[in-house]
């Protein structure tokens, strides 16, 4: 089953958004 570009982009956003938020939170706590 081939993934469409839209599905790939959606998966990237879903994966990166929590990672980005966790990174921001960790940098805020580190200061």
Curated annotation (Swiss-Prot):
GO terms for biological process: photosynthesis. It is found in: Cellular thylakoid membrane. Its main location: membrane. Pfam families: PsaM (PF07465). Keywords: Membrane, Photosynthesis, Photosystem I, Thylakoid, Transmembrane, Transmembrane helix. GO terms for cellular component: photosystem I; plasma membrane-derived thylakoid membrane. InterPro entries: PSI_PsaM (IPR010010), PSI_PsaM_sf (IPR037279). It is a single-pass membrane protein. Disulfide bonds: none annotated. The chain crosses the membrane at residues 6-25. HAMAP family: PSI_PsaM. Belongs to the PsaM family. This is Photosystem I reaction center subunit XII. The lineage of its organism: Bacteria, Bacillati, Cyanobacteriota, Cyanophyceae, Synechococcales.
């Amino acid at each position: 089953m081939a993934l469409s570009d839209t599905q790939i982009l959606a998966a990237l956003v879903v994966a990166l958004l929590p990672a980005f938020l966790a990174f921001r939170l960790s940098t805020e706590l580190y200061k």
